[in-house]
């Protein structure tokens, strides 16, 4: 049976690697492995998110949903050292890599968690995510609905999705589901959506 990056316990044989994240304000060397999302490079969607998302708030609880080996969580933690960054993933190997990478990068404000971990707070300031589209539309919608509801009033989520993986239909669904969304960047076939928890929404 094949192993997927959204499996809780990947069965793929270990193939350790290293990915360098080079941004104008952050440089990271991150350990990777098989069985996690994009283990061989910083994928272009995640790069778009890291380069174009609005700066995170200086403090509060920030979430990397579907953290993989930790590039988003570690960049968030670097940019907001007084905040707590929750790196959430169903994949045990991904969580282990993220914790190790945060430790090696000197980022004590990163906390890893499973999606059902009660320690993750319910008033999140920001969510950044390259969501696991391949889990299927129904599962994706349920996941996003659950986590977006945990944004504090005025909180924002930045979601990056490939156009050929349904970015435009996801944008439409967010609007129809009552989540105001705007496309704030596009590059290399990816869309970056900014979703706001408007307390006035119905």
Residue ranges and their predicted role:
Residues 1-24, 35, 39:
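N-terminal auxiliary segments of SAM/dcSAM-dependent transferases
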Residues 3-15, 166-202:
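Class I S-adenosyl-L-methionine
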Residues 31, 111-113, 182-184:
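General small-molecule cofactor/ligand-binding pocket signal
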Residues 44-121, 126-129:
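Conserved SAM/SAH cofactor-binding pocket of Class I
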Residues 126-138:
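Glycine-rich phosphate-binding "P-loop"
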Residues 133-135, 162-167:
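Short "lid" loop at the C-terminus of a central beta-strand within the Rossmann-like core
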Residues 141-153:
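A short glycine-rich, Lys/Arg-flanked "PGG" loop and its adjoining helix->strand segment in the class I
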Residues 154-161:
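Conserved beta-strand signature within the Rossmann-like core of class I S-adenosyl-L-methionine
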């Amino acid at each position: 049976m094949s192993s997927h990056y959204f499996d809780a316990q990947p069965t793929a044989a270990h193939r350790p690697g290293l990915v360098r994240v080079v941004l104008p304000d952050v440089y990271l060397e991150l350990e990777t492995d098989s069985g996690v999302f994009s283990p061989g490079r910083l994928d272009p969607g995640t790069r778009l998110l890291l380069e174009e998302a609005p700066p995170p708030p200086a403090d509060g609880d920030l979430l990397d949903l579907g953290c993989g080996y930790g590039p988003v969580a570690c960049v968030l933690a670097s940019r907001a050292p007084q905040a707590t960054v929750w790196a959430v993933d169903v994949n045990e190997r991904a969580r282990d890599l993220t914790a190790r990478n945060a430790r090696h990068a000197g980022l004590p404000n990163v906390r890893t968690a499973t999606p059902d971990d009660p320690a993750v707070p319910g008033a999140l300031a920001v969510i950044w995510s390259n969501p696991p589209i391949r889990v299927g539309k129904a599962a994706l919608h349920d996941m996003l609905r659950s986590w977006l509801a945990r944004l504090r009033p005025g909180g924002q989520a930045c979601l990056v999705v490939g156009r050929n993986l349904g970015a435009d239909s996801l944008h439409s669904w967010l609007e129809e589901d009552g989540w105001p969304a705007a496309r704030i960047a596009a590059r290399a076939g990816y869309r970056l959506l900014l979703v706001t928890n408007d307390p006035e929404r119905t």
